[in-house]
């Protein structure tokens, strides 16, 4: 199972945001234990900005995940997306480029029209555990 991890899940961990920390950290632990995970390129820049640098967090993160190769075609796909939020459309474009099975996010409602199924961190962990 290949997953793309949305920025909100990363920020839950980096900022220790309760009550989301446990499930979101579990997603990164799944990746650390060998699960196939990726983050969109722009998630890195969003985290760097919001974490006032966050080099250590990002360096550790990049030991666990891939960053899908995306380009102009993917950006145009995102711009033409039916999703209301453009940042989410860029997440979907990255997920499609990487052939992700799921997008792990807390913002499920933003991904209703996504061609890649969105799942919450808690539900993903249950699915990954076989439940």
Predicted feature residues:
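Active-site neighborhoods of divalent-metal-dependent phosphate/nucleic-acid chemistry enzymes
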Residues: 63-108
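Acidic, PIN/NYN-like endoribonuclease modules and their adjacent C-terminal/linker elements
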Residues: 92-131
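Structured helix-beta-strand junction loops
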Residues: 33-34, 64, 81, 114
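Short strand-turn motif at the edge of the Rossmann-like AdoMet-binding core
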Residues: 42
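A residue-level structural signature of the nucleotidyltransferase/glycosyltransferase Rossmann-like core
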Residues: 2, 36, 67, 103, ...
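Helix-adjacent hinge/juxtasegments
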Residues: 49-69
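Short, well-structured N-terminal submotif of metal-dependent ribonuclease cores
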Residues: 1-39, 52-56, 122-131
């Amino acid at each position: 199972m290949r997953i793309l991890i949305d920025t909100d899940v990363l920020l839950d961990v980096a900022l220790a945001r309760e009550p989301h920390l446990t499930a979101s950290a579990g997603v990164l632990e799944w990746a650390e234990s060998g699960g196939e995970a990726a983050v969109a390129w722009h998630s890195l820049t969003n985290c760097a900005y919001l974490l006032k640098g966050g080099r250590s967090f990002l360096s550790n993160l990049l030991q666990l995940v891939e960053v899908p190769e995306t380009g102009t075609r993917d950006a145009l796909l995102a711009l033409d997306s039916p999703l209301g939020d453009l940042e989410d459309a860029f997440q979907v474009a990255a997920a499609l480029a990487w052939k992700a099975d799921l997008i792990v996010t807390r913002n499920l409602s933003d991904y209703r029209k996504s061609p890649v199924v969105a799942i919450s961190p808690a539900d993903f962990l249950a699915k990954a555990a076989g439940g």
